[in-house]
Amino acid sequence: MPSGLIVFDCDGVLTYNHSSWQQLHEYFGSRDNKYFAELYERNLITYLDWMKIDIALMIHSWGKPIKRRDVENALSTIRIKQEAPEVIRALKDADYIVAVVSSGIDILVERVCRELGVDLCLYNKLAFHNDELIPGGEALVPLREKPRIVKNLAESFSISIHDTYYVGDSKWDIEVFRNVGHSIAVKPCGEACGFAEHVVSDLREIIGIVNGSRV
């Protein structure tokens, strides 16, 4: 019987970079147009619409087809936080199921999950045709859908949402914080800091928080 479920966001939580999407925009020379984020936030476009727009902007700015290798190169400089392996190992040794639920990009999130050895990893998938990036993909973790996804994940392991931990860092994580039993925000976390049960500067603090809740 597992001790519980601990779900991590990826960008800015397990990595030093706060947005893999922003990383791609900067690499390919496009503007990360906040206008489309606002349209999504207002429920005027879907997350897949937003993905298509972002990718189209990147391709247009790059001025030539973007290959899978280009995307891999763009994301290769994003590093996993130094303390992350120690924390994930300690949580797994304590019999917690460790999952990542990220609205980031599969090529990065898969690498992070593989290197850290997490139990389950959910993310959005880019679309390639003959190794060429095309607008589209699979929006498996839309930002607004995170509360539902985390709840369903807990239920799949027969773990109460009230016994579930969620670790995030942005305004998009606030609704998840409100729904889980234990919420942890990782600095810098902006307005999300005010909605979490715990706020940490170093991931290693999570070990003490989890151990303390078991006493």
Question: Which stretches of residues belong to each language-model region?
Answer:
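Short acidic-hydrophobic, aromatic-tinged amphipathic segments that line or gate anion-handling sites
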Residues: 122, 198-205
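Substrate-recognition "cap/lid" segment bordering the active-site pocket of phosphatases
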Residues: 111-164, 171
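Active-site neighborhood of HAD-like aspartate-dependent phosphohydrolases
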Residues: 1-52, 56
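Short, acidic loop-to-helix structural element flanking the phosphoryl-transfer center
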Residues: 72-100, 104-106
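Surface-exposed amphipathic alpha-helices with a cationic face
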Residues: 85-93, 146-147, 151-158, 178
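Acidic, Mg2+-coordinating phosphoryl-transfer loop and its flanking beta/alpha structural elements
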Residues: 98-103, 162-201
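Metal-dependent phosphoesterase signature
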Residues: 53-83
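Short, charged, surface-exposed secondary-structure boundary motifs
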Residues: 129-136, 193-199, 208-213
